[in-house]
């Protein structure tokens, strides 16, 4: 009784407080107490297990932390575990001994009632105190473990604090530097304000809206930013506010400058484009293949906005300038003073003298009289000594009339044959023009600009110019493509009075480094050499941009050996009251050139060439002209096999190789050159005795320039032209060249031309003479622009070759894509799907079978096959069953005609009326729905664009977006290859029961293709088709 009550009181402290309860318990209560006692012990054991498990979990966590953060040594872990196990054992032994002592220390002389009460009280108090001690010890152990585990964390936090201090220190330094930069930026802006009246950009650049920028800046504040990004944004805001104050104080038309300001404006513009886009449906997400290469900020940039910004940046300096708002320095153009000897000449004497000088003809009022010697043109002694030194004894016919006309300040159109000295005719007045003006200051551009169509001609003019510029103290820079731009930029920054350039590279120089490399503000003298060739090669937009940026009261001079009427009309747009000087007729081969034309077969041309080389190569250098780069390389191999050392020159060769080849040919290191017409213009080679037109020239002007490479400066030369019977259409131009130069026309050439004319007349065709280069690359009028080839326009738009004047490039791309789709639309009435249950045959079905038989008989009667006739399969089956042979099936002409008509209808997407009536009757009996189909041909788009829209992911996205079915059909055919009958080029078939779904799918496909074309336009790199790399 006492033991039971003792245990009961020990495990239940709340009940032990009442002694009366324990005394009034029955035996059944005691039994229940025993069970409760056991349950309470098991609960204590469970609690201890859970505590030990939680302790183990904490230990494992601390060990993991230690391993990850500092990787503590394993010995410490083991020692710590040993210490913990010892303390745990000590705690267990203490608790056992304490329990024994408490049980053995009860007094025996007291009554049971007092004994029970006191023992239960002691045990209860002792149990509570031991529990509290255990709890305190456990807490201390846990704190020790936490301290040991957090030691590494404290160290890490200390490191993080130090790093933050370093970052804050760095930010403070950056903030100080930024404030210093703002001060420097203020100085630069003030300097830009002072020199603002000389800027060519101000009149065209629109000022950014400050309110709009402020609004976009507020939108950016709401985004979560990295602290460093937030600091950079604060710096940008400070710069922007400072710039706004400077703009408000400086006037309305002033432009923002400084790289930081430009960056901020660009960011604001891009953000605006993203914010303004309004999408009514969910945005179509695409897999970003370049996600690892670009940041999230770059992904926000709209493609069209970026492209527009890039193109605007490139064309910034090429926009037309309002010259009325720019104050130009006055300059002098008229330097010519007529000497008394020329003043005494009468008009009749002048006409006689002009006639003696190879028939000079002059158009235009106020043209001065021609000079007879160098001293009469008013040049300095330094130039006269240089002329004497380099062997210029007296002026040539073009020089006698052109030099006084240019010296008097007039614009000039000079037309003279090749080798007549046109270069000196515009160089001497140019030197006098430059020497009259003040010297260049730092940052100023050239005074004279000479533009040429080819790099070789530019180098040749530069070489000729340097003969005089050294003695005059002038600087000449040759600017041309194909070489490194950095060296040319360095030369231009040092300053140059004369620039000899090709138009494309000159525009690059004007746009480079925001226009700080060079400018056209000081230009007062412009020369266009080989002007017609320059316009013909497609340089018209570039030439006009450069000329339009030069002050309008400039002096402009144009020279060429050929000047077609169409080119002449175009040239007058940029000339002011010009004088036209023509020497020796228009485009005549020099009389010192002996011309021979040989009508020959293609197979015998090479043998004839070897014969000519064996006869003439000992006497001097030889040029062989061909029409294509491939032919030049092929002929080079054949000549090398025949043991003739030679070189080839064409547009596919690297510029450095071209320079070295021309130098070797001029120096006589290599005496045989195979070239295309790229070498025909302005190439002056001494000791050149023979020109062979291995491929016949396709127009008159090309023939004149090829033949003009020899017979220069009074030397004798020979020109041989090979022409085959297939090239009879070119014979007329060659006959014309021979007649105008006073050379007898070979009889076989005349016979070839007359036969060709008779053949064309018999075929009812009109013979049109080729005018040579027909101005590819620029537009003469509106009609020509409207009739341009659609596919070429798309290629130009995709590759970034469209003119800067085209403002509707984006609209053109959409139109070109639509035209290339060659879309075919169809609307079909489809029967509604019925149930699959097959009804049992009834009397009605039998009647329908009879109707079908009667219809079949009627169809056979319509096809004139007779009532009992059978189709082809039935005829073949009956023949085999009877053991006979299969005869050729009899098909009527009407059947063949119907089959052909079906093919034509399928191509034209045409449905006959009879078929429509039958479908309508069938549709009236059954429920039907319309099915919309459209086919988009994608065969002729670039490969990457086709891949973009035919990938599995893209088709799936478009189908989900538009709810239309899209399938790829047909076969890819390369350009120039047409599909056979029954085959089709690759196309996308769009099908849906909803017309809107088809339209949405088509619009999405168009968008993908347009984006790809614009991407190609922005990242286009030219691919070389020849053996050589093109720079």
Swiss-Prot record:
<dbReference type="Pfam" id="PF00271">
    <property type="entry name" value="Helicase_C"/>
</dbReference>
<feature type="cross-link" description="Glycyl lysine isopeptide (Lys-Gly) (interchain with G-Cter in SUMO2)">
    <location>
        <position position="779"/>
    </location>
</feature>
<keyword id="KW-0449">Lipoprotein</keyword>
<dbReference type="InterPro" id="IPR011545">
    <property type="entry name" value="DEAD/DEAH_box_helicase_dom"/>
</dbReference>
<feature type="modified residue" description="Phosphoserine">
    <location>
        <position position="346"/>
    </location>
</feature>
<feature type="cross-link" description="Glycyl lysine isopeptide (Lys-Gly) (interchain with G-Cter in SUMO2)">
    <location>
        <position position="915"/>
    </location>
</feature>
<dbReference type="GO" id="GO:0005524">
    <property type="term" value="F:ATP binding"/>
</dbReference>
<feature type="region of interest" description="Disordered">
    <location>
        <begin position="1"/>
        <end position="228"/>
    </location>
</feature>
<feature type="compositionally biased region" description="Acidic residues">
    <location>
        <begin position="201"/>
        <end position="211"/>
    </location>
</feature>
<keyword id="KW-0378">Hydrolase</keyword>
<feature type="short sequence motif" description="DEAD box">
    <location>
        <begin position="529"/>
        <end position="532"/>
    </location>
</feature>
<dbReference type="InterPro" id="IPR000629">
    <property type="entry name" value="RNA-helicase_DEAD-box_CS"/>
</dbReference>
<dbReference type="GO" id="GO:0016607">
    <property type="term" value="C:nuclear speck"/>
</dbReference>
<dbReference type="GO" id="GO:0001650">
    <property type="term" value="C:fibrillar center"/>
</dbReference>
<dbReference type="Pfam" id="PF23469">
    <property type="entry name" value="KH_12"/>
</dbReference>
<dbReference type="GO" id="GO:0005654">
    <property type="term" value="C:nucleoplasm"/>
</dbReference>
<feature type="modified residue" description="Phosphoserine">
    <location>
        <position position="928"/>
    </location>
</feature>
<feature type="compositionally biased region" description="Basic residues">
    <location>
        <begin position="81"/>
        <end position="103"/>
    </location>
</feature>
<keyword id="KW-1017">Isopeptide bond</keyword>
<dbReference type="InterPro" id="IPR001650">
    <property type="entry name" value="Helicase_C-like"/>
</dbReference>
<dbReference type="InterPro" id="IPR027417">
    <property type="entry name" value="P-loop_NTPase"/>
</dbReference>
<keyword id="KW-0507">mRNA processing</keyword>
<dbReference type="GO" id="GO:0005686">
    <property type="term" value="C:U2 snRNP"/>
</dbReference>
<dbReference type="GO" id="GO:0003723">
    <property type="term" value="F:RNA binding"/>
</dbReference>
<feature type="modified residue" description="N6-acetyllysine">
    <location>
        <position position="776"/>
    </location>
</feature>
<keyword id="KW-0007">Acetylation</keyword>
<feature type="modified residue" description="Phosphoserine">
    <location>
        <position position="199"/>
    </location>
</feature>
<feature type="compositionally biased region" description="Basic and acidic residues">
    <location>
        <begin position="26"/>
        <end position="49"/>
    </location>
</feature>
<keyword id="KW-0175">Coiled coil</keyword>
<feature type="modified residue" description="N6-acetyllysine">
    <location>
        <position position="903"/>
    </location>
</feature>
<keyword id="KW-0539">Nucleus</keyword>
<dbReference type="GO" id="GO:0005684">
    <property type="term" value="C:U2-type spliceosomal complex"/>
</dbReference>
<feature type="cross-link" description="Glycyl lysine isopeptide (Lys-Gly) (interchain with G-Cter in SUMO2)">
    <location>
        <position position="325"/>
    </location>
</feature>
<dbReference type="GO" id="GO:1903241">
    <property type="term" value="P:U2-type prespliceosome assembly"/>
</dbReference>
<dbReference type="GO" id="GO:0005634">
    <property type="term" value="C:nucleus"/>
</dbReference>
<comment type="function">
    <text>Component of the 17S U2 SnRNP complex of the spliceosome, a large ribonucleoprotein complex that removes introns from transcribed pre-mRNAs. The 17S U2 SnRNP complex (1) directly participates in early spliceosome assembly and (2) mediates recognition of the intron branch site during pre-mRNA splicing by promoting the selection of the pre-mRNA branch-site adenosine, the nucleophile for the first step of splicing. Within the 17S U2 SnRNP complex, DDX46 plays essential roles during assembly of pre-spliceosome and proofreading of the branch site.</text>
</comment>
<dbReference type="InterPro" id="IPR014014">
    <property type="entry name" value="RNA_helicase_DEAD_Q_motif"/>
</dbReference>
<feature type="compositionally biased region" description="Basic and acidic residues">
    <location>
        <begin position="112"/>
        <end position="200"/>
    </location>
</feature>
<protein>
    <recommendedName>
        <fullName>Probable ATP-dependent RNA helicase DDX46</fullName>
        <ecNumber>3.6.4.13</ecNumber>
    </recommendedName>
</protein>
<dbReference type="GO" id="GO:0005681">
    <property type="term" value="C:spliceosomal complex"/>
</dbReference>
<keyword id="KW-0694">RNA-binding</keyword>
<keyword id="KW-0597">Phosphoprotein</keyword>
């Amino acid at each position: 009784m006492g033991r039971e009550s003792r245990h009961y009181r020990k495990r239940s402290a709340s009940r032990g407080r009442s002694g009366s309860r324990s005394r009034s318990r029955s035996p059944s209560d005691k039994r229940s107490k025993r069970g409760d006692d056991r349950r309470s012990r098991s609960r204590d054991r469970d609690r201890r297990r859970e505590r030990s498990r939680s302790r183990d979990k904490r230990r494992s966590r601390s060990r993991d932390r230690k391993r990850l953060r500092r990787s503590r040594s394993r010995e410490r872990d083991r020692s710590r575990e040993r210490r913990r196990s010892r303390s745990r054992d000590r705690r267990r032994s203490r608790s056992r001994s304490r329990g024994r002592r408490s049980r053995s220390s009860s007094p025996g002389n007291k009554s049971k009632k007092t004994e029970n009460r006191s023992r239960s009280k002691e045990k209860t108090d002792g149990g509570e105190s031991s529990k509290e001690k255990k709890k305190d010890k456990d807490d201390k152990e846990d704190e020790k473990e936490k301290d040991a585990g957090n030691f590494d964390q404290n160290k890490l936090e200390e490191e993080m604090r130090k790093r933050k201090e370093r970052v804050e220190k760095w930010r403070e330094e950056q903030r100080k530097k930024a404030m210093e930069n703002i001060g420097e930026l203020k100085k630069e802006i003030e300097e830009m304000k002072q020199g603002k009246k000389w800027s060519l950009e101000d009149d065209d650049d629109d000022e950014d809206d400050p309110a709009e920028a402020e609004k976009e800046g507020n939108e950016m504040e709401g985004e979560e930013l990295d602290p460093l990004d937030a600091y950079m944004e604060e710096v940008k805001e400070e710069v922007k506010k400072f710039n706004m104050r400077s703009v408000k104080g400086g006037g309305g038309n002033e432009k923002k400058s400084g790289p930081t300001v430009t960056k901020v404006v660009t960011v604001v513009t891009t953000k605006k484009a993203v914010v303004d886009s309004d999408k009514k449906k969910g945005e179509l997400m695409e897999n970003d293949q370049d996600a690892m290469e670009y940041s999230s900020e770059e992904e926000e940039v709209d493609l069209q906005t970026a492209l527009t910004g890039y193109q605007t940046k490139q064309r910034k300096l090429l926009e037309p300038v309002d010259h009325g708002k720019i104050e130009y320095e006055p300059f002098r153009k008229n330097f010519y003073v007529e000497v008394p000897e020329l003043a005494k000449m009468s008009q009749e004497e002048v006409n006689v003298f002009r006639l003696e000088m190879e028939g000079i003809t002059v158009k235009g009022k106020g043209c001065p009289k021609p000079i007879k010697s160098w001293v009469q043109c008013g040049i300095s002694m330094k130039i006269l000594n240089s002329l004497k030194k380099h062997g210029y004894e007296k002026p040539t016919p073009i020089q006698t009339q052109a030099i006084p006309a240019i010296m008097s300040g007039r614009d000039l159109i000079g037309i003279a044959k090749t080798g007549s000295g046109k270069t000196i005719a515009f160089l001497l007045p140019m030197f006098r023009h430059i020497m009259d003006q003040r010297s260049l200051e730092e940052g100023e551009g050239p005074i004279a600009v000479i533009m040429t169509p080819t790099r070789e001609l530019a180098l040749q003019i530069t070489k000729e110019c340097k003969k005089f510029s050294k003695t005059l103290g002038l600087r000449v820079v040759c600017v041309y493509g194909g070489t490194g731009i950095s060296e040319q930029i360095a030369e231009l920054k040092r300053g140059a009075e004369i620039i000899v350039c090709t138009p494309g590279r000159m525009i690059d120089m004007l746009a480079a480094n925001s226009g700080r490399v060079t400018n056209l503000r000081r230009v007062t003298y412009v020369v266009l050499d080989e002007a017609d060739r320059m316009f013909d090669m497609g340089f018209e937009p570039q030439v006009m941009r450069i000329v339009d940026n030069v002050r309008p009261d400039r002096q402009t001079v144009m020279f060429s050996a050929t000047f077609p009427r169409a080119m002449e009309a175009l040239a007058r747009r940029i000339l002011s009251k010009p004088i036209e000087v023509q020497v020796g007729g228009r485009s005549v081969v020099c009389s010192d050139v002996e011309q021979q034309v040989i009508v020959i077969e293609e197979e015998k041309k090479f043998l004839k060439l070897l014969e000519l080389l064996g006869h003439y190569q000992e006497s001097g250098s030889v040029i062989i002209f061909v029409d294509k780069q491939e032919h030049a390389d092929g002929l080079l191999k054949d000549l090398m096999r025949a043991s003739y050392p030679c070189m080839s020159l064409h547009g596919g060769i690297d510029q450095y190789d071209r320079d070295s080849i021309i130098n070797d040919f001029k120096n006589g290191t290599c005496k045989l050159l195979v070239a295309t017409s790229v070498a025909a213009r302005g190439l002056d080679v001494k000791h050149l005795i023979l020109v062979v037109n291995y491929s016949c020239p396709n127009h008159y002007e090309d023939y004149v320039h090829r033949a003009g490479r020899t017979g220069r400066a009074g030397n004798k030369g020979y020109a041989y032209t090979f022409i085959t019977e297939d090239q009879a259409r070119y014979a007329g131009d060659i006959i014309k060249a021979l007649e105008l130069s006073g050379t007898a026309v070979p009889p076989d050439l005349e016979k070839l031309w007359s036969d060709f004319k008779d053949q064309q007349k018999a075929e009812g065709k009109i013979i049109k003479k080729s005018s040579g280069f027909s101005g590819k690359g620029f537009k003469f009028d509106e009609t020509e622009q409207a009739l341009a080839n659609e596919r070429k326009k798309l290629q130009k738009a995709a590759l970034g070759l469209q003119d800067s004047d085209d403002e509707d490039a984006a609209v053109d791309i959409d139109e070109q894509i639509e035209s290339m789709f060659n879309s075919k639309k169809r609307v079909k009435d489809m029967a509604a799907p019925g149930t699959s249950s097959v009804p049992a045959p009834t009397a009605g079905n039998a009647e329908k079978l009879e109707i079908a038989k009667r219809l079949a008989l009627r169809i056979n009667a319509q096809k004139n096959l007779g009532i009992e006739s059978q189709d082809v399969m039935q005829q073949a089956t009956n023949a085999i069953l009877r053991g006979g042979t299969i005869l050729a099936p009899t098909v009527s002409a009407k059947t063949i005609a119907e089959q052909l008509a079906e093919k034509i209808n399928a191509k034209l997407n045409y449905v006959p009326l009879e078929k429509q009536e039958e479908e309508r009757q069938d549709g009236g009996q059954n429920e039907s729905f319309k099915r919309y189909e459209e086919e988009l041909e994608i065969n002729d788009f670039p490969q990457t664009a086709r891949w973009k829209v035919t990938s599995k992911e893209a088709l799936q996205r478009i189908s989900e977006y538009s709810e239309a079915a899209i399938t790829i059909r047909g076969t890819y055919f390369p350009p120039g290859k047409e599909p056979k009958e029954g085959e089709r080029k690759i196309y996308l078939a769009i099908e849906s029961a909803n017309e809107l779904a088809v339209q949405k799918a088509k619009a999405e496909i168009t968008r993908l293709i347009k984006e790809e074309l614009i991407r190609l336009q922005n990242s286009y790199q030219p691919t070389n088709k020849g053996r050589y790399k093109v720079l």
